[in-house]
Amino acid sequence: MKFYTYSGETAAEALKIAQSHHGVDTLVFKTQEIRKKTLTSSGLYEIVVAVEEEENKKAPLIPESLYDEELNEEDVVMQLSSTVEEMRKLAGVSSNQRNYTFSKNKTLLEKDAPLEDTPLEANKQDALLQALKDEANHKKEREKREVKQEEEIKDINAQLSKIRDSLKLIQNMFWDEKNPNSVNIPQEFAEIYKLAKQSGMKSSHLDEIMQLSLELMPLRMRENSVTIKRYFREVLRKIILCRPEDLNLRQKRILMLVGPTGVGKTTTLAKLAARYSRMLAKKYKVGIITLDNYRIGALEQLSWYANKMKMSIEAVIDAKDFAKEIEALEYCDFILVDTTGHSQYDKEKIAGLKEFIDGGYNIDVSLVLSVTTKYEDMKDIYDSFGVLGIDTLIFTKLDESRGLGNLFSLVHESQKPISYLSVGQEVPMDLKVATNEYLVDCMLDGFSNPNKEQA
């Protein structure tokens, strides 16, 4: 006995092809759906038929004219006997695919010798039945082995995860700062403690956060390093303050950027101007005023950006001129004010900016800081410029820093929210609205530029 495989878009089509090669009395060994029919592709069915090696080429015992003339595509297989019916069930073939109907010349069929009574047909059916049983048994055994293998793989992965956690705990037993003076850190927290400390966070702030985590974290969560990191991440998120971008303008917004030299105030202002005027769903009217008349090339740099974006730019020297330009830009939704960079130790020049801020206008003051600055210097800068009434913090050069712990410490200490982050040199793309999720990811997983990831 030989087995042949045929395929078609439907089971009936595959059976027709098989019958065209081997006759209408072909015995079906197996029917299988290979691919379901979808909107974009046709279905695919596979049928396996069993044929005697010396195929009987004679005319079939029952002429085709004896079949019901109204047979549909699904009524394609003759019901030979109860034995064949049992074989059909073992093969898992739908009864609709194997049902033969007889409506004409029934007496003639009864007079003819039954096919199953002949030795040839009986042997064929016995062999096919045994083959079907063997196939069913093999399938069950194969399924059992696959289920067992999947369970073994899951068990191995779980054991490997426990081994990795155990190795981390063993390694952390020998860490240098196992017992800080202020907080007794358990070994299972050593990995996250070292990550946070290497980021540049102030020790007292880190100890405070660790103490908070130890007090609030359930004991059952401490057995897994992934769970510990996830919990610590949530604690940091709650500590960091970020101000959402407010575009519901009831009146024009005046934003002034202040800060020390070299932190990127002018470039950040150009990014903000492009964002408000071009990159948002609504295109806002933007005007620029610069107080930076001392730095060589500062006005030219800003004028170049303003000309590219087709917006007005004015340079002023004193508070009187400043007031005039504010009135002249009354039509704008946003007025962005660039200032001269001053050292945090030049108290006199910093105080000189107050006369512009105290002119009766509602000015939103943002202190621009570079994350490449160490925490102690950041704190000095914030204290010096704090006399101007800082509303938000803008951090630049995130792409040039290896850690953001100093940023976390300053925000935690000052309780001032972060509004924007500069994540690269490209104008206007590399400006991001600050979110605590992004900052925590950068701190614990390393910096990533969201614009380049999307590209």
Curated annotation (Swiss-Prot):
Cellular component terms, GO, for this chain's entry?
Answer: plasma membrane
Topology in the lipid bilayer is annotated as: Peripheral membrane protein
Q: Does this entry carry the keyword Repeat?
A: no
Q: Where in the cell is it found?
A: Cell membrane
Q: Which GO terms describe its molecular function?
A: ATP hydrolysis activity; GTP binding; GTPase activity; signal recognition particle binding
Protein transport in keyword set: yes
* One BP term from GO: bacterial-type flagellum organization
Entries under SMART domains matching the protein: AAA (SM00382), SRP54 (SM00962)
Source taxon at top rank: Bacteria
- Which residues are involved in binding GTP? 259-266, 338-342, 396-399
| Record's keyword terms, sorted | Bacterial flagellum biogenesis, Bacterial flagellum protein export, Cell membrane, GTP-binding, Membrane, Nucleotide-binding, Protein transport, Transport
Entry-linked Pfam families:
SRP54
| Its job | Necessary for flagellar biosynthesis. May be involved in translocation of the flagellum.
Which family is this protein grouped under? Belongs to the GTP-binding SRP family.
Which protein are we looking at?
A: Flagellar biosynthesis protein FlhF
Its source organism is: Helicobacter pylori (strain J99 / ATCC 700824) (Campylobacter pylori J99)
Higher taxonomy: Bacteria, Pseudomonadati, Campylobacterota, Epsilonproteobacteria, Campylobacterales
